[in-house]
Amino acid sequence: MLRSYLSLLDQPYFLIPGNHDDRENLRAAFADFPHIGGSGEFINYTVEHYPIRLIGLDTLLPGSESGILCDQRLDWLDTTLTNSLKHRTLLFMHHPPFISGLPKMDKMGLKGSEKFAEVLQKHSQVEMILCGHLHRPVQTLWENIPTLVATSISKQFLLNLGGEEMETRIPEPTGLYLHLLTEEGLVTHTSLLPSAQ
C-alpha cells in the first residue's frame, strides 16, 4: 500500500525503517530500490548524487518500540563518514537521539546515543539529523548538530511534558519539512497540511 502512495510523487524518495516496520517486508516491497533491496542485516545506505550527501541509518530493534544503534551500525557510520570527510551530510534515522521531555516516548527512545555522539564528534560534515518516532514536531541542538523530528504522517500526539499515561491522539494537522540548501547552511521551512479527517 505504501508503495502505491509514494508512486504518486514526482520527486525521488528514500526510506528508512521505523519502529513498526519489518526489514524483510520493506525489502520485498521495494526490492528494486538499491538502498533497500540490497543485502545485509541493516538498511543503512548513502545517496551520493546530490549537492549534499544523504545517509539513511537503520535504528530498528525488532520486537521493541525502542531503537538502537549497535556497534555494527555505528562502525558502518563511522567508516562511511570517514570516507567522505568534506562532503556536506544529512543523517536520517527514525528514533531521535535526545530526551524529548515526552516521558512515554522517551521510554521508547534510542539505545546507543552516547556512542553515536562519540562518532559524530569526529565528523563535522554532518549538518543536520532528521528523525521521526515522536508523532510531534520537535527541534533541538544535539551535540551541536540541529536535530529535527517531523510530524507523523498518520496521527499526532498531545503535547504532554510530564504525563506517564499513553499519548493521546489529537486532530492536529500533519506536515512536512522543506530543507533549502544554501552555501551558508540549511534553512528548514515547516509546511502544515490540511487534515484528512
State the predicted function of each range.
Residues 1-76, 83, 115-125, 143, ...:
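Extended active-site neighborhood of metal-dependent phosphoesterases/phosphodiesterases
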Residues 19-20, 94, 133-135:
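Histidine-centered divalent metal-coordination motifs
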Residues 63, 102-109, 163-166:
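Short glycine-enriched, charge-decorated loop/helix-capping segments at active-site entrances
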Residues 13-15, 89, 129, 147:
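Hydrophobic/aromatic residues located in beta-strands of well-ordered beta-sheets
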Residues 54-56, 90-92, 130:
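Structural motif
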